[in-house]
Amino acid sequence: MSKSTAEIRQAFLDFFHSKGHQVVASSSLVPNNDPTLLFTNAGMNQFKDVFLGLDKRNYSRATTAQRCVRAGGKHNDLENVGYTARHHTFFEMLGNFSFGDYFKHDAIQYAWELLTGEQWFNLPKDRLWVTVYETDDEAYEIWEKEVGIPRERIIRIGDNKGAPYASDNFWQMGDTGPCGPCTEIFYDHGDHIWGGPPGSPEEDGDRYIEIWNIVFMQFNRQADGTMEPLPKPSVDTGMGLERIAAVLQHVNSNYEIDLFQKLIKAVANVTGATDLSNKSLRVIADHIRSCAFLIADGVIPSNENRGYVLRRIIRRAIRHGNMLGAKDTFFYKLVGPLVDVMGVAGEELKRQQAQVEQVLKTEEEQFARTLERGLALLDEELSKLTGDTLDGETAFRLYDTYGFPVDLTADVCRERNIKVDEAGFEAAMEEQRRRARESSGFGADYNAMIRVDGASEFKGYDHTELTAKVTALFVDGKSVEQVTAGQQAVVVLDETPFYAESGGQVGDKGELKGNGFTFTVNDTQKYGQAIGHIGELASGVLKVGEGVKAEVDHARRDRIRLNHSATHLMHAALRQVLGTHVAQKGSLVNDKGLRFDFSHFEAMKPEEIRKVEDLVNAQIRRNLPIETNVMDLEAAKAKGAMALFGEKYEDRVRVLSMGDFSTELCGGIHASRTGDIGLFRIVSESGTAAGVRRIEAVTGEGALSLVHAQNDRLNELSHLLKSDSQTLNDKVRAMVERTRQLEKELQQLKEQQAAQESANLSSKAVDINGVKLLVSELAGVEPKMLRTMVDDLKNQLGSSVIVLATVAEGKVSLIAGVSKDVTDRVKAGELVGMIAQQVGGKGGGRPDMAQAGGSDAAALPAALGSVESWVTAKL
């Protein structure tokens, strides 16, 4: 009996654990502190700083089953997903890693033992082929002489991509950084399937499938292209779980493995589909994996960066559901089946299931409304079309503004025998991609970052000032030996009391003083294992090797401590009041207050906000001790400590406890007891995205200042209304009700005035070939009344074209109305657009009703004067 996908995953981890590898949990799909990546797309991403020498672990061998997404940027598989046997937006990458430990010999031997060993995967040896980089004789000889693979099944692959080291068998992290040759292992499905071995003209067939890539990191590529040998060569490997599962389960497509078959049946169940071979089922089964895990890792649908990619995947899945016949929301219903099928690998998803379902449902409902608006706009554009092709710019505008997929636009057009300019659409899309690349923070060059050898010892938990030595200076990213007065610089010390920004807490400010110099620290940041003090030399000369007195801004630090401790109390209170689905999605803790983003699917009710505030203040009054303990990460999680979103933890972590109320992993600076916080007040609660809420709050003196300000406003209001605080509410309520009544009466008067104006205007209409034309500028009429007047006049005049305009505060407002029987000749949108162009504005709308605005009021009479000849030409 073949192994299940879950058993294959576990067997891989067990094998490498038996070879002395540390089993490391999958990292977030949102890369931690890595500006070069949109999503985690490979197993090595979480070890990138280790390979770069910027981070150290207490192990030199690791193995993971890493969740990955490839659906944006360089690695974009989205359009192929569902239509090929092996493309996915979400997949799991099995990997083993050596950080300066073993190299080519052991890496190859381990791979061979796992793949062919009887107690492991037990694949037939004669079905396995390998490739090596053309000049990598060492790897070739290991495969041939030690493993025993015949020469005819070992293929050398050279530079096949038009540049030196540009090869399928030479891996590089980016344009610069660690790189090296790789060896790939292929499985031969047999001659009953078309395709040739790697390197042959038929290599794109499905017979020979790559199952494992083993990268030998030997070099550090410089900006000028030169290759410098790494002091400690390393190994990075990757084997797609879905691919090896297909091989071990004796199927030719990843979508035929047990995991996908269960999901495909679940998709069919919620959409009502009966043909289980329909490719749309594959698309949706793949997309629910990427969407659910991205949301669980903190990504929310939006119109930029990661959120935009997520939105595209969700909407692609929804469209395929519609193609299958789904009439109602269905996508969110697949989260439960996904949790079941992922098992232990989906524990975090299970904890956040309700939140993920709510975000998906909200997005699905929003897209349904978007589709309706998009179809209306498309109908209008097609009604104006004179040829048989819809231009690419319009198709792109539908896609960009309404999320209207171009293939759906093409489907609608096809029903009317209209083509879509797909080349024009692609050109507009590429222009958007170019702008996104230019404005994006992704794609940083690691060699351009400050690189610091050595580390700084942080002593800020116990000290706010100490004497230290300058170990490095940087100006404009370059290492220097000294800094002079007025220069901006980064100062690195051997030890420091300054806290570097991390976990949402801002970096410390303060001063570094010494022999005739003062350096003002405006921020503190981490650079690998070093801590950089960012600021300006106020006076004197500062040199590497000098002694300094490092002094943190005490008062500012104290305010930050209170706010950070209050954040932990509030997090725990939110989980008590709203539920355990609440998870931190981001935070900012500074000396002014705190900002906390968390998962919750609706706005908090006033009574819920009050409960959270009361609960936090109750813990403050209890004056609980705030204690820290350092322990293993796994032990901390077992204790129930919550981890903070977006934070990267070492193997030994600080666990912060506030009595029996809160336990979290945190490396930040905190108060000694909860009573130090004094007072906690919530300033605001708002939404930042679907399924994400934000609370802003203040503590201590800041909270007291807020109370004073609120009391001052209350007293001022009481004085203005000649009321005391007890009767103030009743007085304001009565005033609001009276104002409402007066506004209603005023609106009625305006409508009566508009009706009278309409009656007077109808007599001024002129007849043009049986159609009444009325053009008029009205004084003293509110712009929003023009539409009502146009509707009245259309009813009075019958077949008609009406243009009304008014000027308010120097701005022109225009409304054009055309009776239905005339819209085949005169379209309101075109008419109002012609007028708007003359008054410095723009507008649009339906063929029977359109509106516009403009800024050139002086040009209005002439613009209105041009209407009669324009309409006459159409009639």
Curated annotation (Swiss-Prot):
One of its GO terms (molecular function) is ATP binding. SUPFAM superfamilies: Class II aaRS and biotin synthetases, Putative anticodon-binding domain of alanyl-tRNA synthetase (AlaRS), ThrRS/AlaRS common domain, Translation proteins. Keywords: Aminoacyl-tRNA synthetase, ATP-binding, Cytoplasm, Ligase, Metal-binding, Nucleotide-binding, Protein biosynthesis, RNA-binding, tRNA-binding, Zinc. Binds 1 zinc ion per subunit. PROSITE patterns: AA_TRNA_LIGASE_II_ALA (PS50860). Its EC number is 6.1.1.7. It is an enzyme of class 6 (ligase). One of its GO terms (cellular component) is cytosol. InterPro entries: aa-tRNA-synth_II/BPL/LPL, Ala-tRNA-lgiase_IIc, Ala-tRNA-ligase_IIc_anticod-bd, Ala-tRNA-synth_IIc_core, Ala-tRNA-synth_IIc_N, Ala-tRNA_ligase, Ala_tRNA_ligase_euk/bac, DHHA1_dom. Zn(2+) binds at residues 564, 568, 666, 670. Pfam families: DHHA1 (PF02272), tRNA-synt_2c (PF01411), tRNA_SAD (PF07973). CDD domains: AlaRS_core. Disulfide bonds: none annotated. It is found in: Cytoplasm. It catalyses: tRNA(Ala) + L-alanine + ATP = L-alanyl-tRNA(Ala) + AMP + diphosphate. GO terms for biological process: alanyl-tRNA aminoacylation; negative regulation of DNA-templated transcription. It comes from the Bacteria. The keyword Aminoacyl-tRNA synthetase applies. Its cofactor is Zn(2+). Catalyzes the attachment of alanine to tRNA(Ala) in a two-step reaction: alanine is first activated by ATP to form Ala-AMP and then transferred to the acceptor end of tRNA(Ala). Also edits incorrectly charged Ser-tRNA(Ala) and Gly-tRNA(Ala) via its editing domain. Belongs to the class-II aminoacyl-tRNA synthetase family. HAMAP family: Ala_tRNA_synth_B (MF_00036_B). Consists of three domains; the N-terminal catalytic domain, the editing domain and the C-terminal C-Ala domain. The editing domain removes incorrectly charged amino acids, while the C-Ala domain, along with tRNA(Ala), serves as a bridge to cooperatively bring together the editing and aminoacylation centers thus stimulating deacylation of misacylated tRNAs. NCBIfam families: alaS. Homotetramer. This is Alanine--tRNA ligase. It comes from Cronobacter sakazakii (strain ATCC BAA-894) (Enterobacter sakazakii). The gene is alaS.
